[in-house]
Amino acid sequence: MSLSSAFRAVSNDPRIITWRIEKMELALVPLSAHGNFYEGDCYIVLSTRRVGSLLSQNIHFWIGKDSSQDEQSCAAIYTTQLDDYLGGSPVQHREVQYHESDTFRGYFKQGIIYKKGGVASGMKHVETNTYDVKRLLHVKGKRNIQATEVEMSWDSFNRGDVFLLDLGMVIIQWNGPESNSGERLKAMLLAKDIRDRERGGRAEIGVIEGDKEAASPGLMTVLQDTLGRRSMIKPAVSDEIMDQQQKSSIMLYHVSDTAGQLSVTEVATRPLVQDLLNHDDCYILDQSGTKIYVWKGKGATKVEKQAAMSKALDFIKMKGYPSSTNVETVNDGAESAMFKQLFQKWSVKDQTTGLGKIFSTGKIAKIFQDKFDVSLLHTKPEVAAQERMVDDGKGQVEVWRIENLELVPVEYQWHGFFYGGDCYLVLYTYDVNGKPHYILYIWQGRHASRDELAASAYRAVEVDQQFDGAPVQVRVSMGKEPRHFMAIFKGKLVIYEGGTSRKGNEEPDPPVRLFQIHGNDKSNTKAVEVSASASSLNSNDVFLLRTQAEHYLWYGKGSSGDERAMAKELVDLLCDGNADTVAEGQEPPEFWDLLGGKTAYANDKRLQQETLDVQVRLFECSNKTGRFLVTEVTDFTQEDLSPGDVMLLDTWDQVFLWIGAEANATEKKGALSTAQEYLVTHPSGRDPDTPILIIKQGFEPPTFTGWFLAWDPHIWSEGKSYEQLKNELGDATAIVRITADMKNATLYLNPSDGEPKYYPVEVLLKGQNQELPEDVDPAKKENYLSEQDFVSVFGITRGQFTALPGWKQLQLKKERGLF
């Protein structure tokens, strides 16, 4: 087959395309068989999707555990050719059975099914309406599940997992007593998917609860007729999951191939920065041996790029890692989100739009805040999400300070003044369609005591409970104030480096104070106290120098008119409007004297603006076992927010922790520490003071919902639980009748070959005067139809037919010419 014909199915339309290696050629796998993989084969999977206005393509070559070396090499070659066909931009992945990446598993929401055999043993991917099946599937996992064909025996069972006995027209689900509701729900959805996609919706499904087998005697009879007498079930087997701490260790290597010898040189360890990557070279990034990335620079030769995967495999062998280690190769300029998140900061130069710009004291780079239309925030939650704003900050505000570990109200005239030695709670109330919504900010000063920090979190829980868990809780570390927090104080937010505002404990005002003022409107302006020295100045900002006798408002050359106007409003607040304006370069000598003398400061021309290139990511978090486990959910939708889970949405400049209504008490209580541990163990070396927002199911603000396409507030009230889906299956009567009929069919077995004695429909439709085969009972012609022909003729299964009244059966047989 020519490459042009093999890749004819490829387009820019968002979809999944799967090929199987058959006799060293590519063969398309039908859509109905997607997610089914034969253990003796190799596959190539192409994912095409749109991320904003950009096209994202990923090529995965999958290796079955029983596939041959020739098939594996062939799959690797076709992967390279497909990459070339698509212009070299896709991310390439090497996937090994049982060790697939979260990205790969995420494509198959209903789960992956491993099937025995392969091309060499004549196994084909069949189309819909095939009933000649007899297999036992071992289902593992809760979110991205995998189902493996195992021996048809009770010895295959264990108490912690779910098993599906698939008999073609009947699927029986057996739930291990120690399996959880999430696993049972996913297994049931897989059973329904098999029924609908492979059996045309005609198979019957039954469920046995492993700890209540006596409640399903009919279904247990079917299991024992098929598997033999029930034996003792094995104990549960724990899933091998790499915890977040293990994944946090990363190492970057430079790769060269001198005289045919692989040479790797250690470059750096965590935290990594983007500048370490030279565009003319190739690099390997080793994530604790759990995953290997190969980065191919734009200037690397074609030969070097094509050899990237083989270099990775050589590296794995050299390090003594398992051959199943996941490998991902990325191209310079088209890196995956998984790769970029391993770096402390990944930015794209010369862009003026995107997620959070960079600001830091003493450096020239600064934030450019754009104006936005407040009216869009609730009608278009995606705008609220991008702007990090639920409204314009004009709601009701209450402020408390932690004093002697208790909450003390802060008088209105002191709203907006925050001291680094204190902790505060700020409750913000706003209305949406006449219904109150709440945000509870927990502001923690840099110099607050450990007891005060703990008390602020504890008191926040108390306030939250007063409102029945409705408030969104936001932890704010000093200096990391979110935009909406600043908007609450309408451009009059002042942050003192230390001290306290408690009555009787106020410290005397120092003789000289310097405030850095940045922001260009009332939604993003604050004054932050910095060290009173010339080195603190920045040409792109406005500074207020305040003494007991005189005040100076210093305008940096790079500050804008809007920034200067907002600074004047803060002068009114801090100095009663009495401050001399000083332009950079025209400072009087006393200005420098007050700052301890003139010294160098950040006064170069404005740095090239950078836009952080980040992708919003969703994770399932768990610490039930004492280990912090994080599982990424790729291509996420609202349906991935399960009521029984705690989910983490990472937008890089802030982290949302979503708590499902059915999450266990331990995880609810440890929500904040869960988010903090995520930041601390993040392989890129994330800022541990990143704002954390704790959100409860049913109280999601638009800043959260805007990251999900077509958010539906009624999805959980309308969605069906495991028990509801189970009840829809009805009783086991039809299954018992079908299996009884299947047993009766053994009366028509050919003793010589053990195969059912079925006849083609046209043979059985012969008239009374035409001879039928000797062993066919003319009154029971339907018994000689294969399962597939039976459904084709009658439109119902054999079990459903048997359940009908005798007169109805006779009528149907007459109508179809079988009587």
UniProtKB/Swiss-Prot annotation:
Tissues in which the UniProt entry reports expression: Most highly expressed in the endometrium of the uterus, the intestinal villi and the testes. Weaker expression also detected in the brain, dorsal root ganglions and on the surface of the tongue.
Main location: cytoplasm
Molecular function terms from GO: actin binding; actin filament binding; Arp2/3 complex binding
Subcellular location: Cytoplasm, Cytoskeleton; Cell projection, Lamellipodium; Cell junction, Focal adhesion; Cell projection, Neuron projection
Record-listed a 1,2-diacyl-sn-glycero-3-phospho-(1D-myo-inositol-4,5-bisphosphate) binding positions: 109-116, 135-143
Cellular compartments per GO CC: actin filament; axon; cell projection; cytoplasm; focal adhesion; lamellipodium; neuron projection
Superkingdom field: Eukaryota
Region (Required for interaction with F-actin): 628-819
Phosphotyrosine: residues bearing it: Y85, Y748, Y758
InterPro entries: ADF-H/Gelsolin-like_dom_sf, Gelsolin-like_dom, Gelsolin-like_dom_sf, Villin/Gelsolin, Villin_headpiece, Villin_headpiece_dom_sf
Keywords annotated in UniProt: Actin capping, Actin-binding, Calcium, Cell junction, Cell projection, Cytoplasm, Cytoskeleton, Phosphoprotein, Repeat
Phenotype of null mutants: Half of the homozygous mice die during embryogenesis, the other 50% do not show any noticeable abnormality in development, growth or behavior and are fertile.
Chain ranges of the HP domain: 753-819
Keyword flag Endoplasmic reticulum: no
GO biological process, one term: nervous system development
Region annotated Core, chain positions: 1-731
Repeat as UniProt keyword: yes
Residue ranges of Gelsolin-like repeats: 24-73, 145-185, 262-306, 403-454, 525-565, 628-669
Region Headpiece: start-end pairs: 732-819
Biological role stated in the UniProt entry: Ca(2+)-regulated actin-binding protein which plays an important role in actin bundling. May have a unique function in the morphogenesis of neuronal cells which form ganglia. Required for SREC1-mediated regulation of neurite-like outgrowth. Plays a role in regenerative sensory axon outgrowth and remodeling processes after peripheral injury in neonates. Involved in the formation of long fine actin-containing filopodia-like structures in fibroblast. Plays a role in ciliogenesis.
Protein family membership: Belongs to the villin/gelsolin family.
Complexes and interactors: Associates (via C-terminus) with actin. Interacts with F-actin. Interacts with SCARF1; the interaction occurs in embryonic dorsal root ganglions at 18 dpc and induces neurite-like outgrowth. Interacts with PLCE1. Interacts with ACTR2 and ACTR3; associates with the ARP2/3 complex.
Descriptive protein name: Advillin
Gene transcribed to yield this protein: Avil
